[in-house]
Amino acid sequence: MNISIIWKLSADENSNLITLQCLKEQIIAADLNVQVLIYQKENDEKNRFISELETLKIKADKYALINENSLYEHAQKHVTGDIITYLNGGDRWTPGTLRQVQEISEKYSKNNIFMLRKVMPDGTGGAFAMDEMNKKIVVQDVTKEFYCYPFYFGGTFLSNKVFVENKFDETLGMETEKDFFLRLMAKEKKFIFLNSQIYESVEVQEGNSTFYEGIYKREWYEESFTEFWIPFLKNLKEKYGKVPSFIQYHFMFTVKSRIMSNLNNRNKHVISQGQEKLCLERMGQAFQYIDCLLYTSD
């Protein structure tokens, strides 16, 4: 099996070295053909990363990052692996992850999505579901289990087919990955959860009301609803007759995240005084696509 890894470099050199070491250890431990696509913001040379990876007989290529979301469409044209995944500089996996993904993807060959247990820098999983039975491998059916899963690319492995054939809409800014993965899951309905393999993200994700960078951005409170959630939910209702329940749960989680991020007086929010009502009205417009039983039940 071949694996393609999309690696977006960090501005912090030490973070990149953490990920480089992780990749070297993973690749040495697994008998795999690996392709690494390296993306960077600045036009400086990172030949050290390429040369070190190539000593392991890995195909590594470096590309300039035009904007945060342009790499997805570019990578879709250049990946060669059977399985595709993504890393930010500073991210790392549990030892043996690539070998485990190889084995599981071959065993569950009809599935296209494989997700690791994702944790943030403090070791917590945020609001996202964990398997209470502590099974190593769980087949998750999102039509039956309405949890709020961490639908972002880091820590997720996709088959080449679903990665290449589905569109990343980079005009959605910070919601680009969410749009891609929620639409994909609405079609696929099932994914494989590798509960024993951990992906540690260097970036804090939505749900953390102190360190998630979105709480300081106006677009998280405005464009997120006007440009993404409202038209997204409307489109799903027209397509499926109702918005899939797992997506409704995810929407409720995002609303709660914004409210919880603005319950204090530390002036970290970006909603101007007097604009709170307008922000709530935008959220309210999206609720026309949410089942009332979902937000009135305990």
Predicted regions: what they are:
Residues K24-L65:
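Acidic donor-binding segment of Leloir-type glycosyltransferases
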Residues D12-I27:
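Short, well-formed alpha-helical segments that are part of the catalytic scaffolds
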Residues R117, F191-Q205:
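Catalytic beta-strand/loop signature of glycosyltransferases that borders the donor
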Residues I84:
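Short aromatic/hydrophobic "clamp" motif used to bind/position activated sugar donors
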Residues I137-L158, Y216:
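A recurrent flexible, glycine/aromatic-enriched loop bordering the glycosyltransferase active site
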Residues G173-F180:
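Acidic donor-binding loop at a coil-to-helix junction in glycosyltransferase catalytic cores
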Residues G96-F128:
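Conserved donor NDP-sugar-binding/catalytic core segment of glycosyltransferases
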Residues Y295-D298:
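Conserved small/polar residues in nucleotide/adenosyl-binding loops
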